[in-house]
């Protein structure tokens, strides 16, 4: 069959070809297919004759070989950074500069990068340079200067080593010698001056009163007494204007202003999985301060919702419903402002057990706010790896490009909307999962730079969103910020106790909201890498599998997804569970597609496709930090001690203390099943109960380090 003249073949412009090894470095090779302009045979060398009509009926292509560095030693990576072909591999430099600190310190990299400077000439002696020796024509130095310029521009915080700033001083000295008066030299000089002036101001001035996290927590001496509840209710009422006294627009705009300022200051390096996952290790208290600030703000907003709704137990149901409705309207306004961070924080609080179980209060909520609440909750549904929230964020990011394309010639360009401000936790989880799935080093002590490229794909999205957040035009409103700071925060125990005082368990709806079990870590890892193979536009893993029944410090609570109910009816209540009781989980998972794990890993059964020889179980630790789960693959050969050690490793508890813990299976009805120390867990566990397990310290053993999410 003949092909229509002038019609292009439907071939992929870039096709994988394989790998090549050269001098110990591994390259990925692909073939790039490009259109080529071919001159008609009738056209002379001068181009005076018109091209032949026959020439326009053919499309000419040329295929070029493209090599990108996949793995190499540090010296080779530095050489590629300086002398590599940036047109052929444009992502190498930004990926390297954003992730290099995972495998080499800044000072060490500068030692590789900066060539030694010649000694200064004796006084009165002038050294004449030939054209070859002239620095302006020295290709190597110009390449190094270009790299330093990009480094100073995109990652200036890498050179902040207080108080000496020795790394930045070395860069400034080199640029003053290699490129005096250049933009790069001026940038280094200006950056060093800014760092020194900032240090002087910190020494001379008192630290400003900046709100950096959750306000104080209300406490009572005897939580079971009625007098204590009355005192607690009185203590929870803040002095001065309360947050809900302001309009919906004002509160939503101030929350957006705080979120965008914190998100714009996030350092990309702190988001890397190898950095963020170590934040709770001993000696890492000050690690990732910019990311911690966003987490603290998220938890503060969630705490404000809990405090304002539960902080006045004496309110009647219609009055409490008005507070619920206002928070729903604030959440809707955050959605209109494209602030997904505060939107998720508000929804997480409204969906937490202490608020969600208030049947009478939800029953007094009007139909329209209730419908809005259900629609907003669908944004962060955990189905299909949080596909809904990811697609919405992609659409919001694409808004700017589509508006620019729609501008007609001669018309004024329309101003793109600001933002969006994303929920940073999704990106953090993606990066942690990438760090867990891919090794840092490959065989032969080669740095796995392909892993760094994948991390850069996520960091580049964060960087692009940070730039778009600069287009917001919001002004601070001090009274609202003061009211936000004055809102007392409730502990988890207080939230449950006040909720049960407001509506005793007997008055709660017996039917619990059916919360879909979060997709396991293994499944999301497999899904992400499988989607990357098929080049899906929305292929990135989702949030960690750590459902909680209420707000826990440092990580947002899980969002229960309620079934659709008739308009005007209150959402189903979680029932009368206590603080330590997990919410009931639904096992009706969507049918997953089988995915294959890369890197030669054995196939791990998915939750809906459990094999007869393996199970994916979830293990928590019985402590005061809430129900923090970690997923573990359990095979028919696993004994209790090995399961305990693996679970403690997932929870960042030192391994020598594994003998201090016992493994229990959590059964319905607040019952637990002790797994004997030498038992085969696969056969000792109850096959009909939910596969939730708990580690509990043996009696008489010493206290261990606190456990926190990683």
From Swiss-Prot:
What GO biological process term is on the record, naming one? Ras protein signal transduction
Question: Sites of the modification Phosphoserine?
Answer: 52, 508, 512, 555, 569, 573, 591, 601
- Sorted UniProt keywords: Guanine-nucleotide releasing factor, Phosphoprotein
Q: Where's the Ras-associating domain?
A: 613-700
Bias (Acidic residues): 198-207, 397-407
Please report the stretch or stretches of sequence annotated as the Ras-GEF domain: 247-505
Is Zinc found in the keyword set? no
Compositionally skewed regions (Pro residues) per UniProt: 568-577
Q: Which residues form the N-terminal Ras-GEF domain?
A: 65-200
Task: Spell out the residue ranges making up region: Disordered.
Answer: 28-54, 198-234, 397-419, 526-609
GO cellular component, as recorded: cytosol; plasma membrane
Q: Which GO terms describe its molecular function?
A: guanyl-nucleotide exchange factor activity; small GTPase binding
Region: Interaction with HRAS, MRAS and RIT1, residue numbers: 612-707
PROSITE patterns per UniProt = RA (PS50200), RASGEF (PS00720), RASGEF_CAT (PS50009), RASGEF_NTER (PS50212)
Which Pfam families does the record associate with it? RA, RasGEF, RasGEF_N
Q: Which CDD domains match?
A: RA_RGL3 (cd17212), RasGEF (cd00155), REM (cd06224)
The UniProt entry, under SMART domains, shows: RA, RasGEF, RasGEFN
Bias (Low complexity) occurs at: 535-553, 578-590
**What information about domains appears in the record's comments?**
The Ras-associating domain plays a central role in the activation of Ral-A GDP/GTP exchange activity.
Partners and quaternary state? Interacts with GTP-bound forms of RIT1, HRAS and MRAS.
Q: What function does the entry list?
A: Guanine nucleotide exchange factor (GEF) for Ral-A. Potential effector of GTPase HRas and Ras-related protein M-Ras. Negatively regulates Elk-1-dependent gene induction downstream of HRas and MEKK1.
Q: What is this protein called?
A: Ral guanine nucleotide dissociation stimulator-like 3
Q: Which gene encodes it?
A: RGL3
């Amino acid at each position: 069959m003949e092909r229509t003249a002038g019609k292009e073949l439907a071939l992929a412009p870039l096709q994988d070809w394989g790998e090549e090894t050269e001098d110990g470095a591994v390259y990925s090779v692909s073939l790039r297919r490009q259109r080529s302009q071919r001159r008609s045979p009738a056209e002379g060398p001068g181009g005076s004759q018109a091209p032949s009509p026959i020439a326009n009926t053919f499309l000419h292509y040329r295929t070029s070989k493209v090599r990108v560095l996949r793995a190499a030693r540090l010296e080779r990576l530095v050489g590629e950074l300086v002398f590599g072909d940036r047109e052929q591999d444009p992502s190498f430099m930004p990926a390297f500069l954003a992730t290099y600190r995972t495998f080499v310190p800044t000072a060490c990299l500068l030692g590789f990068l900066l060539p030694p400077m010649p000694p200064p000439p004796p006084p009165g002696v002038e050294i004449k340079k030939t054209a070859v020796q002239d620095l302006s024509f020295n290709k190597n130095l110009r390449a190094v200067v270009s790299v330093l310029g990009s480094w100073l521009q995109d990652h200036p915080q890498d050179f902040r080593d207080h108080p000496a700033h020795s790394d930045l001083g070395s860069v400034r000295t080199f640029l003053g010698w290699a490129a005096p008066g250049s933009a790069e030299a001026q940038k280094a000089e200006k950056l060093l001056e800014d760092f020194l002036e900032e240090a002087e101001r910190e020494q001379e001035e008192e630290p400003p009163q900046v709100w950096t996290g959750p306000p104080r927590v209300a406490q009572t001496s005897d939580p079971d007494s009625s007098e204590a509840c009355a005192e607690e209710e009185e203590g929870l009422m803040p002095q001065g204007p309360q947050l809900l006294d302001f309009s919906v627009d004002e509160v939503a705009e101030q929350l957006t202003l705080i979120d965008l300022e914190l998100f714009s200051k996030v350092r990309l390096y702190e988001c890397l999985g190898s950095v963020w996952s170590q934040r709770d290790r001993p000696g890492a208290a000050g690690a990732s301060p910019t990311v911690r600030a966003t987490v603290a703000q998220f938890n503060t907003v969630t705490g404000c919702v809990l405090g304002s709704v539960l902080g006045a137990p004496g309110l009647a149901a219609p009055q409490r419903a008005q507070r619920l409705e206002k928070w729903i309207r604030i959440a809707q306004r955050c959605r209109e402002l494209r602030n997904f961070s505060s939107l998720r924080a508000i929804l997480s609080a409204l969906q937490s057990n202490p608020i969600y179980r208030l049947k009478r209060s939800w029953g007094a909520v009007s139909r329209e706010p209730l419908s809005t609440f259900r629609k907003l909750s669908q944004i962060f549904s955990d189905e299909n790896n949080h596909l809904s929230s990811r697609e919405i964020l992609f659409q919001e990011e694409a808004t700017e490009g589509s508006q620019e394309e729609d501008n007609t010639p001669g018309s004024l360009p329309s101003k793109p909307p600001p933002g969006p401000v994303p929920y940073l936790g999704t990106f953090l989880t993606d990066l942690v999962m990438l760090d867990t799935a891919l090794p840092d080093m490959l065989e032969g002590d080669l740095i796995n730079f392909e892993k760094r490229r994948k991390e850069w794909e996520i960091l580049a999205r964060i960087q692009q969103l940070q730039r778009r957040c600069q287009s917001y035009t919001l002004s601070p409103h001090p009274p609202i910020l003061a009211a936000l700071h004055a809102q007392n925060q409730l502990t988890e125990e207080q939230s449950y106790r006040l909720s049960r005082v407001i509506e005793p368990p007997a008055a709660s709806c017996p039917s619990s909201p059916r919360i879909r079990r979060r997709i396991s870590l293994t499944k999301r890892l497999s899904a992400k890498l499988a989607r990357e193979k098929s080049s899906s536009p929305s292929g990135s893993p989702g949030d960690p599998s750590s459902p909680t029944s209420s707000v826990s410090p440092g990580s947002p609570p899980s969002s229960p997804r309620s079934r659709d109910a008739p308009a005007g009816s209150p959402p189903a209540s979680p029932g009368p569970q206590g603080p330590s009781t997990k919410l009931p989980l639904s096992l009706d998972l969507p049918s997953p597609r089988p995915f294959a794990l890369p890197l030669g890993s054995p196939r791990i059964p998915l939750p809906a496709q459990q094999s007869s020889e393996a199970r994916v179980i979830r293990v928590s630790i019985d402590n005061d930090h809430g129900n923090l789960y970690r997923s573990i693959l359990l095979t028919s050969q696993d004994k209790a001690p090995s399961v305990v050690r693996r679970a403690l490793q997932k929870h960042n508890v030192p391994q020598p203390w594994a003998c201090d813990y016992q493994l229990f299976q959590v059964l319905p009805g607040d019952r637990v099943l002790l797994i004997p120390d030498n038992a085969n867990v696969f056969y000792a566990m109850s096959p009909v109960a939910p596969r939730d397990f708990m580690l509990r310290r043996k009696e008489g053993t010493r206290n261990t380090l606190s456990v926190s999410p990683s």
